[in-house]
Amino acid sequence: MKEELLKRFTKYVKVDTQSNEESTVCPTTPGQMELANILVTELKEIGMQEVTVDEFGYVMATLPSNTTKEVPVIGFLAHLDTATDLTGKNVNPQVHENYDGKDIVLNKDLNVVLSPKQFPELANYKGKTLITTDGTTLLGADDKAGITEIMVAMNYLINHPEIKHGKIRVAFTPDEEIGRGPERFDVEAFGAKYAYTMDGGPLGELEYESFNAAGAKLTFNGNSVHPGTAKNKMINAVKMAMEFDAEIPKEEAPEYTDGYEGFYHLISLNGDVEQAKSYYIIRDFDHLKFVERKTHIASIAEKLAEKYGEGSVELKLNDQYYNMREKIEPVKEIVDIVSAAMRNLDIEPKISPIRGGTDGAQLSYKGLPTPNIFGGGENFHGKFEYVALESMVKATEVIIEVARLFEEKE
């Protein structure tokens, strides 16, 4: 299993599938369709049935039931794209066997070092096989580790018919990193009662709570006048944007919050005297607090518009996804089954809220309750991203055990 995981993973990460928020097509980048087509070929090769890919890059396939029991159809999902934070082009994975717990020099020329001083969790991986970047790109374990684990688990089940399971559906989706993954996902065609995204982090992670999420696009319209004659005439749009940001509680930012704490996050601010634009994301687990945060943003915009005049501040506020806990708690047994599967494999489940979003958050609201299971990676979205091969083995075993337990309980 280890060899197959390593071979598939290092192949998949070399395909540049970084998504692009500026694109209006789906998938937003051609590399995602390239990987989708590779996976279609490989799914057929291992013996999966009903293998399809649509024009938008959504891959679906079926592993038929091998039991006489009536077992609910379950699904496993992972996303094709990698994050926009750092390039995913020319990924050159480095394999470090029997990690010694010390610094790993990712790139000598650029002095990029993966160090336990900066990342103390590396101590957990002593003696393991780590797959890292070469210090110039992200790795793409988010979520090509998940893709790999699903592929290997399906191959294992096909080759071990003594493990009884119901019908299993798998899907690989585009553009998750920019929040568009579920937009064109056909829940009815997928046909599962429950599903799981293999999109979590370290060993044992199990998540069924996500943020409520919104985005706020602000445009500040100023009045540019020659600075020599600007008195009582100039309105500096950049300063308006700064004034707006000064009204946001400084301690309610990502760098000061964790656990169940929500935040406002200024993603970008650019412009000049005439016009400036800023973009915030708003996050909270509690729905009432989420509404309060959006109201606060709107009230600041209104206050500045009153001060600087009609048309001076434009706000576009849009909800992005909601806390999936509301949709999963009524069917909490799907979380309990994963916990049991992990314990059967000597993994301690680490149930915590996702300080982010997954496709599962939106899919849960489309009628497909979808918790999130660990994929094994650490330090996603950057050059220090890595994954332990042993964690990928465990994630693969969890998929197999979940399928077995669903059949066993019927």
UniProtKB/Swiss-Prot annotation:
PROSITE patterns: ARGE_DAPE_CPG2_1, ARGE_DAPE_CPG2_2. Binds 2 Zn(2+) ions per subunit. Pfam families: M20_dimer, Peptidase_M20. CDD domains: M20_peptT. Its main location: cytoplasm. GO terms for molecular function: metallopeptidase activity; tripeptide aminopeptidase activity; zinc ion binding. This is Peptidase T. It comes from Listeria innocua serovar 6a (strain ATCC BAA-680 / CLIP 11262).
